[in-house]
Amino acid sequence: MVNQNKIIPYLFLVPALVFLLFVYIPIFENVFLSLFQWSSFSPEKTFIGLKNYVELFHDPVFYQALTNNVLYAVISIVCQVFGGLILAAVLEDKLVRKWSPFFRTVFFLPVVISMTVIALLFDFIYNPETGLLNQLLQAIGLDQLTRAWLGDDSTAMLSVIFVSQWQSVGYIAMLYIVSIQKIPDELYEAARLDGAGKIQQFFHITVPQTKEMSFVAVVMTLTGAFTVFNEPYILTGGGPGKASEVLSTFLYKSAFTKDMMGYASAIATVVLIITLALSLMQMKFFKTGKEE
């Protein structure tokens, strides 16, 4: 019995050890491998120090991909976080609440659909010849706006980003619905008695009361925006040219097309630093706002 009591505390260390094994060790190994020039087909590795990072920061494709990720992040914050909050507030309004289960299902459905299916759907919608989008524009007399949405440098990235927003906004809205349901009805009732309208209630009650969920949503959205891969890779492959290249597709091509494993490890390290820095900034911002 005494021996069992001695063992039990060590059992609680198992999850931490598993986390260390599958998360931290691969991260450190990736950083270590980024200091070498090596190929997946050869066991030999040549130590080159920070040369991969120097080349990366002089590579115009890296800055093109980073710019696209920043654009992805900005649009995602506006559409997913702010848009998701507005959508959740509308679905939780008393006038819409009886229809809320139906609309929740409609908006959450894209979240559970495979990205491959979604890509095929939007590939059909964006098709320049038979796509629904161009046919709709022609039907309302806007023929001059029709184009190859995924094949045009000026629209490829925005078209890919739209797919992500369509798929993800419902998930963020569901998170906000849970948060809004925890807000006491007395706050809204008092605001109505003071003559506050729907918009005033939204900005003075809903937004402040869902601040913690907003923090979670922003961190998730920013992390997703800087690690996005499926949408640009399946829809455009990073093209046309490098118009829709993002850091993850850039990493993938460097590793598995060009077999530049050390260079790809350097890209992965930079992505890790960016996402970690953004998360820490959000934590600092959230703590500051909470203290105020």
Swiss-Prot record:
<keyword id="KW-0472">Membrane</keyword>
<keyword id="KW-1003">Cell membrane</keyword>
<feature type="transmembrane region" description="Helical">
    <location>
        <begin position="70"/>
        <end position="90"/>
    </location>
</feature>
<feature type="transmembrane region" description="Helical">
    <location>
        <begin position="7"/>
        <end position="27"/>
    </location>
</feature>
<dbReference type="GO" id="GO:0055085">
    <property type="term" value="P:transmembrane transport"/>
</dbReference>
<dbReference type="InterPro" id="IPR000515">
    <property type="entry name" value="MetI-like"/>
</dbReference>
<dbReference type="InterPro" id="IPR035906">
    <property type="entry name" value="MetI-like_sf"/>
</dbReference>
<keyword id="KW-1133">Transmembrane helix</keyword>
<feature type="transmembrane region" description="Helical">
    <location>
        <begin position="106"/>
        <end position="126"/>
    </location>
</feature>
<feature type="transmembrane region" description="Helical">
    <location>
        <begin position="215"/>
        <end position="235"/>
    </location>
</feature>
<feature type="transmembrane region" description="Helical">
    <location>
        <begin position="160"/>
        <end position="180"/>
    </location>
</feature>
<keyword id="KW-0813">Transport</keyword>
<dbReference type="GO" id="GO:0005886">
    <property type="term" value="C:plasma membrane"/>
</dbReference>
<protein>
    <recommendedName>
        <fullName>Probable ABC transporter permease protein YurN</fullName>
    </recommendedName>
</protein>
<comment type="function">
    <text>Probably part of the binding-protein-dependent transport system YurMNO. Probably responsible for the translocation of the substrate across the membrane.</text>
</comment>
<feature type="transmembrane region" description="Helical">
    <location>
        <begin position="260"/>
        <end position="280"/>
    </location>
</feature>
<comment type="similarity">
    <text>Belongs to the binding-protein-dependent transport system permease family. MalFG subfamily.</text>
</comment>
<dbReference type="Pfam" id="PF00528">
    <property type="entry name" value="BPD_transp_1"/>
</dbReference>
<dbReference type="InterPro" id="IPR051393">
    <property type="entry name" value="ABC_transporter_permease"/>
</dbReference>
<keyword id="KW-0812">Transmembrane</keyword>
<feature type="domain" description="ABC transmembrane type-1">
    <location>
        <begin position="66"/>
        <end position="282"/>
    </location>
</feature>
